[in-house]
């Protein structure tokens, strides 16, 4: 067993942290925001920082020997190292641009890796009060009720989600729009909702059939959602079709029926 408790205890403490951080997000959602730029279109607010500080303090009090990786602390120091030690990977506010604009697709994402494997996942949208949870080998849940990926088996009837990203280099944008243009002829429709973690949870609960994203911020965007998708019966993998790498900033997710066709479509 991992240090300082069982996986169920880890989940309980992560849920506590996510819900309390959610209160901070909910309070800030309806107020004037003080926004900083991390890049041309990549934003950060005082709420991001306050939530990360709270979550890390909450987790460190309970699990002082564990390791911690967070979006805002990594942005400040510029690097991170994922080891075999139990490691909490946190995005305190996934969907910051949505938060700034008052678009209610925002969440806290908390993932725990043990021996580099995503093991516990918590994704909480405090604006609409949806809590997604998962433990490796023990199922996935939305507000305590079991969830499963969709049973859709036809790509042409599938709902796809992706994101445009924050890189505005012309070659990158052209590649992004070219890929989207190709996929639009193969699926029913496309959504860009602005949160990698919630897109993964959308696949997990069957609202979305397909999701992929390239060059997102880091492992904090996917560490929680990846567990939840897998425990809902889905597959998480690299868009090339190779094995998912938590640190590679590339992800795709779908159900068993669509996986092969989705990989083919992504690489045509």
From Swiss-Prot:
The record, for SUPFAM superfamilies, names:
Carbohydrate phosphatase (SSF56655)
Q: Name one Pfam family in it.
A: Inositol_P
Q: What class of enzyme is it?
A: hydrolase
Pathways involved:
Polyol metabolism; myo-inositol biosynthesis; myo-inositol from D-glucose 6-phosphate: step 2/2
User: Per its record, what triggers expression of this gene product?
Assistant: Up-regulated by light and down-regulated by Li(+).
Task: Keywords in alphabetical order, please.
Answer: Hydrolase, Lithium, Magnesium, Metal-binding
Q: What is its EC number?
A: 3.1.3.25
Catalytic activity, reaction form: a myo-inositol phosphate + H2O = myo-inositol + phosphate
List, in alphabetical order, the GO biological process terms annotated in this UniProt record: inositol biosynthetic process; inositol metabolic process; phosphatidylinositol phosphate biosynthetic process; signal transduction
Q: In which tissues is it expressed?
A: Expressed in the shoot apex, roots, stems, leaves, flowers and young and mature green fruits.
Please tell me whether the keyword Repressor is annotated for this protein.
Answer: no
Similarity section: Belongs to the inositol monophosphatase superfamily.
Q: What is this protein called?
A: Inositol monophosphatase 3
Q: From which organism does this entry originate?
A: Solanum lycopersicum (Tomato)
Lineage, broadest ranks: Eukaryota, Viridiplantae, Streptophyta, Embryophyta, Tracheophyta
Task: Identify the coding gene.
Answer: IMP3
